[in-house]
Swiss-Prot record:
InterPro entries: Ribosome_maturation_RimP, RimP_C, RimP_C_sf, RimP_N, RimP_N_sf. It is found in: Cytoplasm. Keywords: Cytoplasm, Ribosome biogenesis. It comes from Saccharophagus degradans (strain 2-40 / ATCC 43961 / DSM 17024). Belongs to the RimP family. Required for maturation of 30S ribosomal subunits. This is Ribosome maturation factor RimP. PANTHER family: RIBOSOME MATURATION FACTOR RIMP. The keyword Magnesium does not apply.
Length: 151
């Protein structure tokens, strides 16, 4: 996770958790000429519109005071959804047995994109099974990952 995203997470996770939600993660991207800050929240009983509204209101207040994002930005708050992004090793551990898709920061074994069954998480490595071949991928190389829902 980039430095600015790490600072935002440290600033905003306690706000989300104080409202009874789990801070799942965040994405900070450029969208045209302004930034887009996406915050993903989770709740055991499921995330409702009211949860998103409450988190958005409180996070907006903190961002207005702290002003960590230069220029204009859009704030979005939502549940991670069925195709949820995976940000931490704990997230990967929760979804062992599921199909995941991920992109690496740099090539590993000649490729950057992988999609397969998440079979294990050991130490700081994620293990994927793709076409009967096992890939052991260092977590620090993962740029983006998400669960691929089954229909």
């Amino acid at each position: 996770m980039a430095g600015k995203e790490t600072r935002l997470e440290k600033m905003l996770a306690p706000v989300v958790e104080s409202l009874g939600c789990e801070f799942w993660g965040l994405e900070l991207r450029m969208q045209g000429k302004q930034s887009l800050l996406r915050i993903f929240i989770e709740k055991e009983a499921g995330v409702g519109v009211e949860d998103c509204e409450n988190v958005s209101r409180q996070v907006s207040a903190v961002l207005d005071v702290e002003d960590p994002i230069s220029g204009e930005y859009t704030l979005e708050v939502s549940s991670p959804g069925m195709d949820r992004p995976l940000f931490t090793l704990d997230h990967f551990t929760r979804f062992v047995g599921e199909h995941v898709s991920l992109r690496l920061r740099t090539a590993f074994d000649g490729r950057r994109n992988f999609s397969g069954k998440l079979t294990a998480v050991e130490d700081d490595e994620v293990i994927l099974l793709i076409d009967a071949e096992e890939y052991i991928l260092p977590f620090e190389l993962i740029d983006k990952a998400q669960v691929v829902p089954k229909f």
